[in-house]
Amino acid sequence: MVQLKQAVRNLSVDSHLSSSEIFNRVIKEVQEFLFRQGGFSAANWGDVLIDCINIWVTEHPNLFKLYHFLNHILILLQTKRKDELSSTEALAYVRDYIEFWEPVANKVTNNFIDAVDLNDASVLLHGDNVLIHQLFKKLADYGVKPNIYQTVTRPTMEGKNQAKILAGLGFDVSYIEDVTVGKFVSLIDVFISGADGIRKNHFINKAGTLMISLACERFKKPHYVLCDSRNIMNEAESSPELIRKLTAEPPKNADAMWAFPPNGVVPISYYYDTTPSNIIDKFVLEFGVFDPEQIEELDVSYPVSSLLDISY
């Protein structure tokens, strides 16, 4: 129990993780926690896991895929009596969830490759996204070597990790400051980003995505958004209170901007921003390539657990 609570605290203070890293860390911590329970029933560990899940949902808004996973764990805890649900059964449920969703990344990247020819292209990337890693791994395997411009992706600087990964795959990567995109946008053929959360008319992603997307619109450069259906907000089943909780972002610690500002100066930092869907070109998901206006037609509904704390 203590180890899981410590893992929650560690994740709270590790502010430079990408969305993919946060998602993978949470899944790992849940699996290890359930394994440590040694087959005992949820009567012994269920309340602790519920509390930690609600902390994760609160501390990591805008990550709709993470919420999708955590909500499914709560649904399991909600639908079975605690004295009838063993940690072994819950762990098997988590492994089944991982196995079910594992092929999705392959489908998304294949759909992009079928839709967009990157031979001799120049590509702009922002953030650090596992789908982007897998896409470029396939391109390397196929001998397709586009020229890459990778942003630093402030304030978390997570673009550095993606630049290292892509360079390790054999690509030439120009590592550029976010604010200098205007100098490079005329040189690119396509901007590729992920999306942490998609709603009917807009999507949430790393801060800077809106600025870059507006530049691409102005210079008539296509913007493709790679994600899977878990990133789409379950609008039909979610209360207004839950939607507000999942889309609210309080200002982050801004010490990296200015540790000791003078009186009258207030550094403000956010990790995410919101981009109108009508300024991008396509969403690429596991079941196809979609125009922005088609997103609200997709059925991504699933039950919402009553164990979720919707206060914020």
Task: Put a short name on every predicted segment.
Residues 13-16, 122-124, 128, 199-204:
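Short, glycine-rich nucleotide/cofactor-binding loops
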Residues 1-93:
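Long amphipathic alpha-helical segments
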